[in-house]
Amino acid sequence: MVDVEGKYSPRLANKRGAARLAAVQALYQMDIVGSGVMETAAEYEAYRLGKDIDGDQYLDADFQWFLAIITGVVKDQKQLDPMLNQQLSAEWSLSRLDSILRAILRAGLWELINRQDVPIAVVMSEYVDIAKAFFEGDEPKLVNAILDSMAKKIRLLK
């Protein structure tokens, strides 16, 4: 969504959208800190989702959706990462990408594979919007291109 000044302004998130954003943040946290899924999930449920943190209000999120994403990504990461690496150039492997970008791509790909009930356009739009919230460069375009390519391959196989 673009505001009157031509700048990106994120849409108000629904509970699933808020869960996706929180899941990306949790995956990033687990990647950086090395915390486990259940520890991170408990922290988000108790102290983050729908809570006020240092004057910022976390959006209320669908906790079950959040939990499904983070547990699914961690469980399936050995399958997701090679699929994502195939979409990247030889010079830019998944390990070279920013941690938050890796989290966005992993969560988006996991949802494309495992949540066939969610339209492709919704998954792509949500994760591109998350990328726009974190990046001002070409990263959202990269997320769009990779998820679009993967969606075509995945949905053809199913």
UniProtKB/Swiss-Prot annotation:
Disulfide bonds: none annotated. GO terms for biological process: DNA-templated transcription termination; transcription antitermination. It holds the Pfam family NusB. This is Transcription antitermination protein NusB. InterPro entries: NusB-like_sf (IPR035926), NusB_fam (IPR011605), NusB_RsmB_TIM44 (IPR006027). Involved in transcription antitermination. Required for transcription of ribosomal RNA (rRNA) genes. Binds specifically to the boxA antiterminator sequence of the ribosomal RNA (rrn) operons. GO terms for cellular component: cytosol. The lineage of its organism: Bacteria, Pseudomonadati, Pseudomonadota, Alphaproteobacteria, Hyphomicrobiales. Keywords: RNA-binding, Transcription, Transcription antitermination, Transcription regulation. Signal peptide: none annotated. It comes from the Bacteria. Belongs to the NusB family. PANTHER family: ANTITERMINATION NUSB DOMAIN-CONTAINING PROTEIN, N UTILIZATION SUBSTANCE PROTEIN B-RELATED. One of its GO terms (molecular function) is RNA binding.
